[in-house]
């Protein structure tokens, strides 16, 4: 498959996954005043002023001035603190110039990795288990070392409620959960995310076991692709590549405060 076609599939999946989050916020956290609108072929989402999911995902390669203006108006009306476009590398030179001219700057990047299914999967080094909601919330917050305030507990709650998702963990010999991870459907894509390992359990193969188990579940469910977003040169990237994923592209975040 051509890389451009795969990027399109993944970006469509990212927008769909973001919409699932918005709907979960609307249903389970109505005070967040979550909202969404189509934007440049993707989705603009508001899920709270401090939420990392207040962003645009899935935008196409050609961002028109009118589409950027519409997104800015959407976020302004919803009292967002900034406007964020998370864009694939197919963004045209003209689109980049439009963003720069309006004051956008690059705030960060993430690597998108993918595995075509079916694929070979080694047996997990640990036995993954499905997590109960209390364990999920506790490990989610501790693994990501998030403060117990503002958006953090809400993100854990909403992620748990994501439709069709599977929430997994790995426990030690005493039954204490050492890490968490999630798989969520987005069309033909299984989105692998929310990978977190408690600080004291890192380096023990927890994430690798959870990646392998989600690959197994994704194949059983008939997905064509498994996709994840990781920080460049991170241990997570190494673990995913070790499990058979390949780097597909780097997504760039353009921000205007």
Predicted features, each with a name:
Residues 1, 36-40, 116-132:
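Conserved N-terminal entry element of GNAT/NAT acetyltransferase domains
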Residues 1-76, 150, 160:
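N-terminal charged segments
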Residues 35-40, 94-105, 165-181:
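Conserved beta-hairpin
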Residues 46-57, 107, 185-193, 202:
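A conserved beta-turn-beta hairpin within the catalytic core of GNAT-like acetyltransferases
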Residues 64-73, 194-199, 203-220, 242:
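Conserved acetyl-CoA-binding loop-helix of GNAT-fold acetyltransferases
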Residues 78-88, 218-231:
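Conserved GNAT acetyl-CoA-binding A-motif
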Residues 92-106, 204, 208, 220, ...:
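Conserved active-site alpha-helix within GNAT-family acetyltransferase domains
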Residues 148-200, 249:
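A conserved beta-strand-loop-helix scaffold within acyl/acetyltransferase catalytic domains
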